[in-house]
Amino acid sequence: MLNTRLIAMSTSDGAPETKKQRPESSSNGSKDQNGTEAGAEGDSRDKVALITGITGQDGSYLAEFLLKKDYEVHGIIRRASTFNTTRIEHLYADPKAHKGGRMKLHYGDMTDSSSLVKIINMVKPTEIYNLAAQSHVKVSFDLSEYTAEVDAVGTLRILDAIRTCGMEKNVRFYQASTSELYGKVVETPQNEQTPFYPRSPYACAKMYGFWIVINYREAYNMYACNGILFNHESPRRGENFVTRKITRSVAKIYHKQMEYFELGNLDSKRDWGHASDYVEAMWMMLQRESPSDYVIATGETHSVREFVEAAFKHIDREITWKGKGVDEVGVENGTGIVRVRINPKYFRPTEVDLLQGDASKANRELNWTPKVTFVELVSDMMKADIELMRKNPIA
């Protein structure tokens, strides 16, 4: 069995039918979905993976996943006054000293081509997972240029760095795409052939990333895939995302640390899955004989309102909704206390009301299906935040 190691990299901090596929180089040493070596006979090279965004939700779960498969993990973080490594510190043998184990961190940045070239040339990866992004939709309206630099041009920089290093025939590339590409949806559910209609600077930047991956795949015979991932959450989700805001707030209410919290559009519906399920799909995409693009989703939709109700149900409380529009409130049954209020500042300039994915292609070709249900997802997040607020009320 081949030895494996992982080089990981972090920066900021989570389709139409693919055109014709190209045959891949036999030196890639990939595995099919059953774990069988594909084209690796006589290839003694270690399998090396490079992940951008290792300090984020998806990057940390992917690092864990690959470590369990005996990968060695190296990570690159942006230079800053403080380390942003909370999600991966447990992967060190000595978390306080950031030493030991099979993971090391290095410095790099998605906005700096030279650092990408140096890293790729040094580690000579066989797999690259591009997870780094400014991924908050509402923030992208305020930081539109930065979002484009990281999410759009950053993807181009990595692809060009691969070619600069002369490794386009030896590297398998995964691009983290997003269901936000569908935006103002033209059909439900959305699959790989559904037209895009992006509704935010984030989605527009990701759309460029999506198409430049396909362009490089066809122009340079690269093994490059887009994973169109629908919303996926976990206890490691960023605090500024609505799902984590809900579970943190309900946990504070449970501990009597907060009376109510504010939200925006309660009726926005999303296809929510668990991040741990979705990183497995990323890996599966790079183990096939030829590259393609895949929608990864649960196929179920739930509203923000339902997420709130499920979170309160976890602490044995029920919410009744009263009023309309910005005057609507969520009232706790029994006590009559208002627990949820609407604040227009949380509305997006252009809303995306409904996203629901059709992952039948991934199920058919990758043998991938989600394992964690919506209720289990909310429960997992609630348990973690209740414990977090118990230990640190000001977290």
UniProtKB/Swiss-Prot annotation:
It is an enzyme of class 4 (lyase). The active site is at T178, E180 (nucleophile), Y202 (nucleophile). Coiled coil: none annotated. It holds the Pfam family GDP_Man_Dehyd. Residues 1-13, 24-36 have a biased composition (Polar residues). Its EC number is 4.2.1.47. Its cofactor is NADP(+). Pathway: Nucleotide-sugar biosynthesis; GDP-L-fucose biosynthesis via de novo pathway; GDP-L-fucose from GDP-alpha-D-mannose: step 1/2. Residues 1-44 are annotated as: Disordered. The keyword NADP applies. Optimum pH is 5-8. Gene3D superfamilies: NAD(P)-binding Rossmann-like Domain, UDP-galactose 4-epimerase, domain 1. It comes from the Eukaryota. NADP(+) binds at residues 53-58, 109-110, 131-135, 146, 206, 232, 237. SUPFAM superfamilies: NAD(P)-binding Rossmann-fold domains. It catalyses: GDP-alpha-D-mannose = GDP-4-dehydro-alpha-D-rhamnose + H2O. Keywords: Lyase, NADP. One of its GO terms (molecular function) is GDP-mannose 4,6-dehydratase activity. Belongs to the NAD(P)-dependent epimerase/dehydratase family. GDP-mannose 4,6-dehydratase subfamily. PANTHER family: GDP-MANNOSE 4,6 DEHYDRATASE, GDP-MANNOSE 4,6-DEHYDRATASE. NCBIfam families: gmd. Catalyzes the conversion of GDP-D-mannose to GDP-4-dehydro-6-deoxy-D-mannose (also known as GDP-4-keto-6-deoxy-D-mannose or GDP-4-dehydro-alpha-D-rhamnose), an essential step in the synthesis of GDP-fucose from GDP-mannose. This is GDP-mannose 4,6 dehydratase.
